[in-house]
């Protein structure tokens, strides 16, 4: 490998061209990891810019193991610079009584970074651009295709040719049916989420709304309010430069044209709404997003018939937000694929994609189930009977301590055996017992 001016090793070309559709966390991670492994990367994203609505996102230890290799550690340093500066995580009931206060030291958190979703995407995208990768923003892919020796996409009537295609276009994936052969089917859960993020200047001059800034002091704060069938989170980010809130409801409610009005209606019977409502009502109209929560049974297969197209991230395995792993598992997906392609080389790209599926399938299915359990816990809090009906381990080792790169090296041959000979195997990264 050669060393570039920044001191980062430049990978030797593998001869493999990877086309990536979708530049959310999964697509960005796949693009960066594929470049790190020496593959040529061509990216397409339908949105013209990287900004996304949303709230906070946590990058956990299992994903940090991948990110720490990017840019000779520069990407991790950026995450550290923009993470929430928290001392405690506070839990309240619907009357506003503090029920739990857990210490949280952002500088000593175990390989975990909590930050704005849009900031995370921008950090990833800027790093990808710095690598000189071919990126096309604001471009809609019209079609996907493959032969025995190549795969590609059709854009503006032109066929773009590669060795494989990664479909990472999210939960409402347009490419998933063509790759998996399964119909576009999502199951709406019994819930809806509202998310908002806006500049703190929107509330700073309102004494009834700016209490969250006073509570944060010189740092940030994160407060969660639990009621029957409803959970509300509010807080600040980037040293209270930004305010966020999110609301999860057990039922699929009919949203008003303004999602803010819907949330105000949901919490109107909470005694603590006298504090929350002034803050929520200050949300700029275009800064609130309402989302029906979706999941779906695991796809029967992630890889196309000829083995040259694969769905990854939410396109393959959407998680409920309660799992706290959507972006993290997408990052793992991208890293595993890139390494599998490096191991097989250009001569056996289909094997690399199928091994990726084998190594990832059991793990993400287990995490999907954990998300369902976490949802049930958070939306069924009964403070009169002890609060949470079931205690979930906050940072289980099988989830947060998993090393997806190490797993590839240790289990590639076993996964290849499962692919080529049809043998059944259990792979790492799942709960034991």
Swiss-Prot record:
Keywords: Alkaloid metabolism, FAD, Flavoprotein, Monooxygenase, Oxidoreductase. One of its GO terms (molecular function) is FAD binding. It comes from the Eukaryota. Gene3D superfamilies: FAD/NAD(P)-binding domain. Notoamides have been shown to exhibit antitumoral activities. Notoamides A-C show moderate cytotoxicity against HeLa and L1210 cells with IC(50) values in the range of 22-52 mg/ml, but the IC(50) value of notoamide D is greater than 100 mg/ml. Moreover, notoamide C induces G2/M-cell cycle arrest at a concentration of 6.3 mg/ml. Pfam families: FAD_binding_3. InterPro entries: FAD-bd (IPR002938), FAD-dep_Monooxygenase_BioMet (IPR050493), FAD/NAD-bd_sf (IPR036188). The keyword Transmembrane helix does not apply. Its cofactor is FAD. Pathway: Alkaloid biosynthesis. The keyword Oxidoreductase applies. It is an enzyme of class 1 (oxidoreductase). Its EC number is 1.-.-.-. FAD binds at residues 45, 117, 314, 327. One of its GO terms (biological process) is alkaloid metabolic process. The active site is at residue 195. FAD-dependent monooxygenase; part of the gene cluster that mediates the biosynthesis of notoamide, a fungal indole alkaloid that belongs to a family of natural products containing a characteristic bicyclo[2.2.2]diazaoctane core. The first step of notoamide biosynthesis involves coupling of L-proline and L-tryptophan by the bimodular NRPS notE, to produce cyclo-L-tryptophan-L-proline called brevianamide F. Belongs to the paxM FAD-dependent monooxygenase family. This is FAD-dependent monooxygenase notI. It comes from Aspergillus sp. (strain MF297-2).
